[in-house]
Structure formats: structure tokens, C-alpha cells
Amino acid sequence: MRNKITSVIAALGTAAIMSTTANAGTLDDVKKRGALRCVVSTGIAGFAYPDKSGVWKGFDIDFCRATAAAVLGDAKKIKAVTSTGKTRFTKLNSGEGDVLWRNTTITFSRDVGVKLRFHGVNYYDGQGFMVNKKLGVKSAKELGGASVCIQTGTTTELNLADYFHANGMKYEAVAIETNDEARQNYMSGRCDVYTTDASGLAATRSTFPDAQNHVILPEIISKEPLGPATRHGDDQWSDIVTWVYYATVTAEELGVTSANVDKMKSSKNPEILRMLGVEGNQGEELGLSKDWA
């Protein structure tokens, strides 16, 4: 009996330690640090890129700033942790970043195998192909024998192999790690084709001095639902990222903006009042301030 009691006490002690560790999660780390670290790309126009002053801007960065505003009360308190397709998950899971706001496809293997928790789709995309007009190609089904620039560690690798196999074509893969590397190889002629999400192709083409000479082919060969991710095992932080995302969607639906938010606190719409913390205790339930949204 004594041994059983000792075992129970030891188990309770272990549980208490684990509970303390779990409670000291990402939210506490971010608050203590005073900055939110967002895992982003190395640079994609329109999504995440540093301007001439080194200030990061873009679609993904805006969501990163929204998260910082909710958690720290200041959208400027962010740090961009740049990553390639191969390193993004390692940087998140190792703790180098707090949240992944990066053009990343939600997949079964990334959720279950890589242990990522996804928090909704903030951009629906699909894989496409870009070629120089002088190649004379009108369809992806005419790309047999082409050299193709493709980022490693992405869903585009398997999609590309499947598409060419299904259409009885062969290709030469030119492996690259960053969008900038793809741009350089494509522009130099090292590869005939660049394939990635269609949004990424459009963003990359917009940076070309001769953008009008490059065409994105009509075929979209995959479904790429993009969304933010956090590590498994921190439910509170997962809830925060999830509801920061949904708060931005709801705010857009209800017409709440940074310019009219103070006026909206006098709204007669109870949904707006709850979102802005005038009524209810949603912020408290998340471990944030009443006006977190």
C-alpha cells in the first residue's frame, strides 16, 4: 500500500510539473519577449517582402501584425523569421518562430506527420506554370521535355510529377529553395518553366522588367488552400491564432476598420460589441485584453 501511495504522489508531482510547463506556453513567451516572431517566406511580392527601408510588408505580414496587435497591443512588435519551403516547419517546431504566417498549403501530412495545427484558409490558390512568350507554348500539355524550376519541400514537387506522368510527358527538374533563386534561374534561361502557386507566379512576374513577355498558362493543376499554422501542444496559443484570423474575417464582413473602430464601439449590433470587447469576456477567455480584436 505504501508503495502505491508513493507512486501516486510521484505521479501527481509529475503531472503538476507538466501542467506548469504547459501553462508557461507561447503566449507567455511572446509577452515576456515583447515581440511576435512570424515565420515568413524569404520574400514574395504582395505576400511578404521588405521595402527599401527594411520594413516587412504584404498579405502574410498584415496577418502577423494583426496577431501582434491582439497579443501585445502593438502591430509593430513583430520579427520576420525568414524561411524556405524546406526550413519553414523546422523553424516553427524548433521554437525559432511563434506562428507561421506564410504561403503554406494545408495538408494531412503536415497536420498529422509534421505536427502542425492549422487555423483556417486565408487564401485559396492552385499550382500553375509560367513561361516566356518566345517559347511559343499555349498550354501546360505542351511542356514535354521542358526544364522546370521547382521549390523543394513543397506540395508542388509531387503535383508536378503527377501531372506530367498523367499526361505522358517528361521534364527536367531544376531544384531551387527560394523564390528569388527561382526568379534568377528562370530569367537566366536555366529553366524553361517556373511552377508554383499561381499567386506566387503573378507576384514574381510583377517584379520582371519585361513582365509583358511572360505568360501564366491557363491550367491550374492543384488545389492549394493556404493558411497559418502553430505547433501542436499549445491549445491556448492555437485558439488565439485561430480567432485572430476569424476576427479579421468578421471585421471585414461587418465593416469594422482601424479607421472606424472607436465609433463602432457604440454600435447597436451585439456581434460587433462582443468582438470589440464592449460586451462579453472573449478576450479574457483567450488570455488577452478585452479589446484584443
Question: How does the language model describe each region?
Answer:
Residues G25, K31-W101, L286:
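Extracytoplasmic small-molecule ligand-binding "clamshell" domains
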Residues R37-G46, W56-L72, T105-I106, D125-E181:
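Bilobed "Venus flytrap"/periplasmic-binding protein-like clamshell domains
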Residues R65, A69, G73, K77-E142, ...:
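Acidic, polar ligand-binding/catalytic clefts
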Residues I17-A24:
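Sec/Tat signal peptide C-region and signal peptidase I cleavage site
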Residues A11-L12, A22, V30:
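Cleavable N-terminal signal peptides
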